[in-house]
């Protein structure tokens, strides 16, 4: 048992096995870092079994969120037989850099448009010590510092530089930790900032603004997306019909504007071009799957594109340049539930994709025990996703609020300065849980929105999801549920894209009820709320401004009446409430 400080840790060791788990192939031995009993989590290596020579077991990037007592243990998984020997077992902490810098704004690929705020903002963190941090905007070509400011060292701070007087061009945001006599003790890798005229956005298929709202073809949008699977064709009608009548024509019954088809990552370019034509004609944009464009991935050798023979960078650059010219491309799906060790690889890929297709976004998704590694991915992705799948038991026994919790994990990782698009459960993960009910799917959707998600993608319209339902009536029924929910969200898109507002000044639930406030140009206020608990809760909201009435958007009836500048509501377990206030 060890006392650990917050940070990222690696547990590793060597194991030799003899006849381990011969009677139960699911058992074995492993190494773990365990937070129990004070915490409710543990992270373990892969399971070793059978007869093997000395083999390294390792799991890296384990986030320890708070100081406390933790256990490193080695031993059985399940009930294995046989013998195992361990040696050189260790737990190591990732070293913290003396200076940490995260570019908060401009938040889309360092593009500083001249019709938007000209204040460059960065989050600075210093590991220890005293001194100052010097922040500068340096001309990239000449190396001349055009603007500089020094800030006193603090554990964390937000530093700002006014770039309003700078001419258009390419600059480097440079952060230096200064010691005695202003000697440079440490320098963080530079961030590129490019000052551009507003009209430059006309060339961008996709970009997001300072409030993390995605713009597609020049129009702001709340992302409503699907994962799907299919074969490829050079016929739009084939894509429209689908293999069994469930193609893009059926998808278009819902207000879907984003699609990931993860079977088409190495499809012929002519077929992808036709697919993009079909999607764009139906108001959908596409994220091309490139999460295996790394030589270390077994699928890489199956890529038929000639550019693949030139290496990863050439492949990514060619695919991005080729597809990026199509208005139907929104970007690239670059990572799916990968460990933090993959960050350098994905970051290199990000640079190649962004250079060849500047008007695109990269999207990566965390989950499957790696969701707490989200902070490690903040610079490697344009848009972060997480995929909480809470429905594993019969209805009423699941912690749906996991969706909101994971959304906050993503928001905290990017310091609310990048979009977070959540992936929601639209499939049966277990036989006991089955398919999400319509009420559960609606609650999960709004929980993510209330916590700040700027997009939702549902997994999956394709295999393991809707496409695997054998009963035609059930398939129609489950699809109709998602169509209704996405239409409800789409109807409120102007509200969801409005700036957040302090509709409530005080609440009585002690944080058990989470809220999101919005104000629209017509003066209406909107309050979206959900109960995080599995038990009912009564909450009183003190309004920030007087009101005369409320309207429940779900029931179409008057909501709780304002009394004394406040409204009171009863929320059932995990219930969502959507109110318009005037």
Language-model features: locations:
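Extracellular and organelle-lumenal recognition/adhesion modules and their flexible linkers in secreted
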Residues: 1-164, 183
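N-terminal carbohydrate-binding accessory modules
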Residues: 184-251
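Aromatic-lined substrate-binding rim segments of carbohydrate-active enzymes
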Residues: 243-304, 319, 342-361, 398-401
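Active-site clefts of carbohydrate-active enzymes
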Residues: 297-298, 409-439, 466-468
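Active-site groove signature of glycoside hydrolases
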Residues: 314-345, 369-373, 379-392
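Aromatic/acidic polysaccharide-binding cleft in carbohydrate-active enzymes
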Residues: 432-483
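Carbohydrate-binding surface patches
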Residues: 508-546, 574
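C-terminal beta-strand-rich structural cap/linker in extracellular carbohydrate-active enzymes
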Residues: 562-582
């Amino acid at each position: 048992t060890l006392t650990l400080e917050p940070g990222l840790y690696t547990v590793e060791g060597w194991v030799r096995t003899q006849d381990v788990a011969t009677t139960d192939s699911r058992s074995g031995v492993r190494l773990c870092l365990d937070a129990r009993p004070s915490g409710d989590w543990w992270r373990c290596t892969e399971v070793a079994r059978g007869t093997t020579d000395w083999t390294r077991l390792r799991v890296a990037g384990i986030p320890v969120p708070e100081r406390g007592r933790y256990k490193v243990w080695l031993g059985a998984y399940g009930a294995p037989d046989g013998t195992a020997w361990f040696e050189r077992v260790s737990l190591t902490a990732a070293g913290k850099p003396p200076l940490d810098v995260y570019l908060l704004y401009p938040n889309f690929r360092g593009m500083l448009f001249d019709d938007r705020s000209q204040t460059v903002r960065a989050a600075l963190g210093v590991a220890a010590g005293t001194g100052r941090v010097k922040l500068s905007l340096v001309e990239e070509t000449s190396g001349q510092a055009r603007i500089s400011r020094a800030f006193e060292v603090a554990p964390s701070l937000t530093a700002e530089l006014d770039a309003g007087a700078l001419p258009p061009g390419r600059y480097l945001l440079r952060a230096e930790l200064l010691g005695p006599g202003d000697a440079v003790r440490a320098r963080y890798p530079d961030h590129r900032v490019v000052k551009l005229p507003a009209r430059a956005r006309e060339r961008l298929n996709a970009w997001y603004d300072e409030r993390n709202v995605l713009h597609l073809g020049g129009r702001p949008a709340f992302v409503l997306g699907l994962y799907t699977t299919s074969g490829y064709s050079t016929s739009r009608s084939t894509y429209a019909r689908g293999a069994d009548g469930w193609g893009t024509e059926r998808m278009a019954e819902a207000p879907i504007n984003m699609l990931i088809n993860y079977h088409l990552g190495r499809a012929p370019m002519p077929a992808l071009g036709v697919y993009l034509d079909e999607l764009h004609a139906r108001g959908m944009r596409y994220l091309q799957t490139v999460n295996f464009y790394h030589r270390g991935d077994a699928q890489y050798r199956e890529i038929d594109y000639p550019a693949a023979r030139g290496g990863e960078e050439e492949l990514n650059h060619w695919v991005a340049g080729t597809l990026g010219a199509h208005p139907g491309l929104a970007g690239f799906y670059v990572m799916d539930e990968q460990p933090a060790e993959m960050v350098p690889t994905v970051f290199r890929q990000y640079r190649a994709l962004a250079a060849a297709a500047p008007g695109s976004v990269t999207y990566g998704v965390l989950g499957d025990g790696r969701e707490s590694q989200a902070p490690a991915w903040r610079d490697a992705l344009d848009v972060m996703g997480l995929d909480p799948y809470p429905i594993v038991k019969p209805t009423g026994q699941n912690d749906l609020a996991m969706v909101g919790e994971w959304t906050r994990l993503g928001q905290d990782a990017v310091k609310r300065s990048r979009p977070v698009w959540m992936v929601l459960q639209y499939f049966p993960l277990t036989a006991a849980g089955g398919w999400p009910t319509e009420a559960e799917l609606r609650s999960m959707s709004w929980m993510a929105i209330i916590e700040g998600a700027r997009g939702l993608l549902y997994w999956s319209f394709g295999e393991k999801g809707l496409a695997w339902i054998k009963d035609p009536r059930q398939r129609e029924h489950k699809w109709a549920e998602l169509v209704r929910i996405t239409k409800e969200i789409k109807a409120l898109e102007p509200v969801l894209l409005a700036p957040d507002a302090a509709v409530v000044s005080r609440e009585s639930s002690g944080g058990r009820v989470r809220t999101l406030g919005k104000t629209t140009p017509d003066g209406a206020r909107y309050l979206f709320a959900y109960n995080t608990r599995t038990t009912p809760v009564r909450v009183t909201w003190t309004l920030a401004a007087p009101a005369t009435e409320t309207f429940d958007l779900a029931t179409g009836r008057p909501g709780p009446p304002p009394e004394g500048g406040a409204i009171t509501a009863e929320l059932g377990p995990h219930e969502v409430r959507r109110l318009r206030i005037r």
